[in-house]
Amino acid sequence: KGMDLLAKRIDEIKLHGVQCGMGGHDLRVVQEIEKPKLPVDFYIKTLHHHKYPTAPKPHELTAAYAEIPGYWCRDPQELVEFMATVEKPWIAFKVMAAGAIEPASAFQYAFKNGADHVLAGMFDYEIAEDAKIACDILSNLERTRPWRS
């Protein structure tokens, strides 16, 4: 019943000529939408590595309270492997883990691992530098997941 209701809402959104995306912090959101192949146009899902000083420790990633409402990308490898099977565009967010990961590392990791777009928070004075970093990475990027947008 829940997925049928969600499918109806997606159709209503599309009737207005608006794209409809779904996602969140938990990979299960994307997985559950993919099972019945609901007609969303794109996904938005957190992605970042855990190679930073304040990264979650393995024991912090096992309990629901640590991941939900979701402050981390709990299992980046599981996400990357799953998204490799998804044929819709993917916007990765929280790629810099609230500033704990440098833009170059964050953007490289996200794009190399299949994200089609990166939603990155930054201050106005960081835009030019971060855009240059992204352009440099994209000009010399090797990835296995095909670009979806």
Named regions from a protein language model:
Residues K1, H50-K51, W72, A97-I101, ...:
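Short, small-residue-enriched loops and turns at beta-alpha junctions
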Residues K14-L15, K35-I44, V86-P89, K112-H117:
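Glycine-enriched alpha-helix->loop->beta-strand junction motifs that scaffold or abut catalytic
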Residues K8, Q77-A92, M96-S149:
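Structured C-terminal cap/extension of enzyme domains
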Residues K1-G2, Q19-D26, I44-H49, E67-C73, ...:
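Catalytic beta/alpha-barrel core
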Residues K1-D41:
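Glycine/proline-rich, positively charged
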Residues G2-M3, K35-L38, K57-H59, A104-F107, ...:
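Short, glycine/charged-enriched secondary-structure capping and boundary segments
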Residues D26-Q31, H48-Y52, A98:
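Short, catalytically relevant binding-site loops at active-site mouths
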Residues E34-G70, E81:
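Histidine/lysine/aspartate-rich catalytic loop segments that bind and position anionic ligands
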